[in-house]
Curated annotation (Swiss-Prot):
Source organism of the structure: Homo sapiens
Name of this chain's protein: Orphan sodium- and chloride-dependent neurotransmitter transporter NTT5
Spans within the Extracellular topological domain: 220-263, 404-495
UniProt record similarity statement: Belongs to the sodium:neurotransmitter symporter (SNF) (TC 2.A.22) family. SLC6A16 subfamily.
Keywords: Glycoprotein, Membrane, Neurotransmitter transport, Symport, Transmembrane, Transmembrane helix, Transport
Keyword Zinc included in the entry's annotation: no
List of glycosylated residues: 229
SUPFAM superfamilies: SNF-like (SSF161070)
Gene name, Swiss-Prot/TrEMBL: SLC6A16
Origin superkingdom: Eukaryota
Subcellular location: Membrane
GO cellular component, one term: plasma membrane
Tissue expression notes: Highly expressed in peripheral tissues, particularly in testis, pancreas, and prostate.
GO biological process: amino acid transport; neurotransmitter transport; sodium ion transmembrane transport
Length: 736
């Protein structure tokens, strides 16, 4: 289909004056309920209206654009031409309760950028990126990721930011305005965001549980617990490592299989509830409180990561870890699976397709430079990933070194016992002094043995290899809760470093949870006027609902379901949602038309390359990623690592057939609103392209919108006046 700019007038500007708006306790936005404020004198009001008219006229004179009548001018002219009578000032109780002025703004652009960065800095994305770097090509994967980030990630992030900011709508309503027939994509993104929010705080509850246990000395995952009424260690723990035992048996109380049910784990219910209380407390007072909390939640992990990185550079094995960081497998550049993994990671790290990006951007002025914001957020996110991955590899190098040292010492003890028992000849006696660098001393001794003695030794002991141990880093949450916690226990003082590490993860998790919940709360407020006036009631109700539903994932088998959704399922609906978003802007609204509107709003030209990326390259790349992942999913069975209580070992099990059926069912449910809303539009004869011009356009939200294209300077002026209007509510209502 064509993506040419339409000759009709734009729909982008002035949406904040006519669309749904949120009442919030931030500067420049309030819900006015004081009846006295509605009865200002006509003389005072007229004077203020004249000042407003003069300001708008000055803004029009400064631009070369054809003069257009803005909503503010229409209100001003109407007010100046007629005296505000007592009857017009009077409002019914019903109308008075619905007086909601301008949508709130972020207190500063810094808060907004930090909110977007905090939403994208999910702990799971950080450790998954490091895991993929380690196991999917090294620097080759990193190069592919960076290429995909700027080719696909930044344009799509810019698209969502521009849509939300221009339309002043959350992730559910914005697409109804841009493309009525594709309006169902907003409902799909809302449902995906809701499902993600159900289990996201469960991961945060794991972090809080570990943090609460880190005050013990030694930390409980450093040594096996003693059996009750005995001086011996727990035999189940002795058959594995303390960190693995603590993860499965103490933290998760994991079942042997996903089929095993059980009630919620009580030791996780309280941390889970605490997570929701913290997120609710941060959001209950709107953007004013959220913005201040974001400073701490985003900046604190950055300082901790830098401090950790400096500290780990001084550890033994850090150099080996950094050497593994720069390893590149050139053959993986030609592997489509690696490209699809990098593309999926770009979608996860940028957070597009969930509606949260558009919701956060909807609280910015329409003239804000969202293109530079998209680049800035992406670059900050990329730098955070690179620093965090470098820190990860330093820690893993230290962890692998310590484990290998202990392996060599254990082998030496085993060999001495076998020699004393006469099972090995005296020539197989290992070096006595393994205190300093035991791995080098042990390996040098082993390589110097005669071949027949060496063969006898290797049959009795395990191989101790630092490269092999380095590659044993676990996937998913276990990357942090197994490999990392064990490494922190090796680092004195282990209590301090463990607490700081989990504090960093918790801050990241909470900032991401705020972004996810903003993608749920904002669309509900935009859609239902009742929720705009009762924000606190909405937040409490939604959080209680999600807490109750999320208890399902705190059961003994809950971690297996989280892996099913996060590693295998969620990327598919996100790709479909993003593809339809590009269709909405590129085909229904028109990519060139959208860019032309943004050029006027922002006051500077935007590269026409986006008019080619959105309708052509991005959808094709996303569909290739979708097909590649689908083929990989069909060819290779999906698996999960479970706990076998009989052997106290981790066991790789395939997901049962009903798990795949569950994925398909969930996918169908969240995608269903797209065709369903299309059918609704066809039945009600809603046009494919949004109407525009002088007449009102009725969007799928049934909101009459009269949109006029306004130059950048004028938009900025109206944004200033919009804040001024909140001081004089009668100005906005005297002509209604």
């Amino acid at each position: 289909m064509k993506t040419e700019a339409q000759p009709s007038t734009s729909l982008l500007a002035n949406t904040s004056w006519t669309g749904t708006v949120i009442s919030d306790s931030v500067p420049g936005s309030q819900t006015w309920e004081d009846k006295g404020s509605l009865t200002r004198s006509a003389t005072s009001w007229t004077s203020e209206a004249q000042v407003s008219a003069a300001r708008v006229a000055e803004a029009q004179a400064r631009t070369s654009q054809p003069k257009q009548i803005s909503v503010l001018e229409a209100l001003t002219a109407s007010a100046l031409n007629q005296k505000p009578t007592h009857e017009k000032v009077q409002m019914t109780e019903k109308k008075e309760s619905e007086v909601l002025l301008a949508r709130p703004f972020w207190s500063s652009k810094t808060e907004y950028i930090l909110a977007q960065v905090g939403f994208s800095m999910k702990p799971s994305c950080l450790w998954r990126f490091a895991y993929l770097w380690l196991n999917s090509g090294g620097c080759s994967f990193a190069a592919i990721y960076i290429f995909m980030l700027f080719l696909v990630g930044v344009p799509l992030l810019f698209l969502e930011m521009a849509a939300g900011q221009s339309m002043r709508q959350g992730g559910m309503g914005v697409w109804k305005i841009i493309a009525p027939w594709i309006g169902g994509v907003g409902y799909s993104s809302f449902m995906v965001c809701f499902i993600l929010g159900l289990y996201f705080n469960v991961v945060n509850s794991w972090i809080i549980f570990y943090m609460s246990q880190s005050f013990q000395f030694p930390v409980p995952w450093e040594k096996c617990p003693l059996t009750m009424n005995s001086s011996g260690f727990d035999p189940e723990c002795e058959r594995t490592t303390p960190s693995i035992y603590f993860w499965y048996q103490q933290a998760l109380k994991a079942s042997d299989r996903i089929e095993d049910g059980g009630s919620p784990v009580y030791s996780l219910v309280l941390p889970f509830f605490l997570c929701w209380c913290l997120v609710g407390a941060f959001m209950i007072n709107g953007l004013k409180s959220t913005g201040k909390v974001i400073y701490v939640l985003v900046l604190l992990p950055c300082f901790i990561i830098v401090g950790f990185f400096i500290r780990t550079l001084l550890l033994e094995g850090a150099k080996f870890g950094l050497q593994q960081l720069v390893v590149a497998k050139i053959s993986d550049v030609y592997n489509m699976s690696v490209w699809s993994l990098a593309g999926g990671q770009v979608l996860s790290n940028t957070g597009i397709g969930l509606g949260s990006v558009a919701s956060l951007a909807s609280y910015m002025p329409q003239s804000n430079n969202c293109l530079s914001d998209a680049f800035l957020v992406s670059v900050i996110n990329l730098l955070t990933l690179l620093v965090f991955t470098s820190f990860n590899f330093c820690v893993l190098g230290f962890w692998a070194t310590v484990i290998t040292h202990r392996c060599c010492e254990r082998n030496a003890e085993i060999l001495l016992k076998l020699i004393n028992l006469g099972k090995l000849p005296p020539d197989a006696k290992p070096p006595v002094n393994l205190l300093y660098n035991p791995t080098s001393i042990y390996n040098a001794w082993l390589s110097g043995l005669p071949q027949h003695i060496k063969s006898m030794v290797l049959r009795e002991v395990t191989e101790c290899n630092i490269e092999t141990q380095f590659l044993k880093a676990s996937e998913g949450p276990k990357f942090a809760f197994l490999s990392f916690v064990e490494a922190m226990s090796f680092l004195p003082p282990s209590v301090f470093w463990s607490f700081i590490f989990f504090l960093m993860l918790l801050a990241m998790g909470l900032s991401s949870a705020i972004g996810i919940m903003q993608g749920i709360i904002t669309p509900l407020q935009d859609t239902f006027s009742f929720f705009r006036k009762h924000t606190k009631l909405l937040i409490v109700g939604v959080f209680l609902l999600m807490f109750v539903c999320g208890l399902f994932f705190t059961r003994p088998s809950g971690s297996y379901f989280i892996r099913l959704l996060s590693d295998y399922w969620i990327v598919f609906p996100i790709i479909v949602v993003v593809v339809f978003e590009t269709m909405a802007v590129s085909w229904a609204y028109g990519a060139r038309r959208f860019l032309a509107d943004l050029t006027i709003l922002l006051g500077h030209p935007i590269s026409p390359i986006f008019g080619w990326l959105w309708p052509h390259l991005c959808p094709v790349v996303l569909l290739i990623i979708f097909v590649t992942m689908m083929v990989h999913l069909c060819m290779k069975p999906i698996t999960y690592m479970s706990w076998d209580s009989s052997t106290s070992k981790e066991v790789l099990r395939p997901y049962p057939p009903w798990a795949l059926l569950l994925m398909i069912t969930l996918f169908a449910i969240v995608i269903l609103p797209i065709p369903a809303y299309f059918v609704y539009c066809r039945i009600h004869r809603i046009p494919f392209r949004p109407k525009s011009g002088d007449g009102p356009m009725t969007a799928s939200t049934s909101l009459p919108l009269s949109h006029q294209l306004t130059p950048s300077k004028e938009v900025q002026k109206e944004e200033i006046l919009q804040v001024d209007e909140t001081k004089y509510p009668s100005t906005c209502n005297v002509t209604s």
